[in-house]
A protein has these predicted regions:
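Extracellular beta-strand-rich solenoid/capping regions of secreted or surface-exposed proteins
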Residues: 33-39, 83-97, 105-120, 128-149, ...
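N-terminal domain-start segments of secreted/luminal proteins
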Residues: 60-96
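Short, small-residue-biased leader/transition segments that mark boundaries at the very start
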Residues: 2-6, 162-166
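Extended acidic/polar, glycine-enriched regions
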Residues: 27-69, 107-109
Length: 166
């Protein structure tokens, strides 16, 4: 099994550093503004240099093995980098796969209609440029009349809400 070494240089004080969840019992060594710790297994953790404020969320995953071919005509493939699909909208139909590679940030909403649709990858679907109910779709992922819709591993940044301003 592989071990991962993480080093983080923080502008915030590390005097009250928490690494959560506690079940992983991660005890970093701290030298001035650098915290160092090791992970022995895939996990998602919150690195909190100033208690619960300003966390750094780390998704430490197994290596991805089920990557669709970017040459497959039924695959819409976004590689690493920022992507802005036309009109901020991705339409998926039957037997299509949307793949967001690790490091991809796709600024869009999705409309899916049909059978055997897959949305996957380690990338980010980002709807934060739009206010709630004002994006290219009513919902960030708008699935209608779908059978066997599979969504796995993507990270979604949802449409923003102005409720906090009220």
């Amino acid at each position: 099994q592989r071990q991962m070494c993480i080093r983080d240089r923080s502008k915030l004080s590390l005097d009250h550093l928490n690494i959560l969840p506690d079940k992983y019992a991660i005890h970093p060594s701290v030298n001035k503004d650098i915290a160092t710790f090791h992970l022995n297994e895939p996990c998602d953790i919150s690195f909190e240099p100033d208690g619960c404020n300003s966390p750094l969320i780390l998704f430490c995953n197994e290596l991805e093995t089920d990557i669709p071919s970017k040459n497959d005509p039924n695959v819409i493939y976004f590689g690493p980098g920022e992507h802005n699909p036309e009109n901020g909208l991705i339409r998926l139909g039957s037997n299509q796969t949307l793949y967001l590679a690790g490091g991809a940030v796709v600024n869009a909403g999705i409309e899916a209609t049909g059978d055997n649709i897959t949305i996957c990858g380690r990338g980010i679907l980002d709807g934060s440029d739009w206010e709630h109910n004002a994006g290219p779709t009513d919902y960030m992922i708008n699935a209608k009349n779908c059978n066997n819709l599979v969504m796995r591993d993507i990270i979604c940044l949802l449409y923003t809400s102005d409720a906090a301003d009220d």
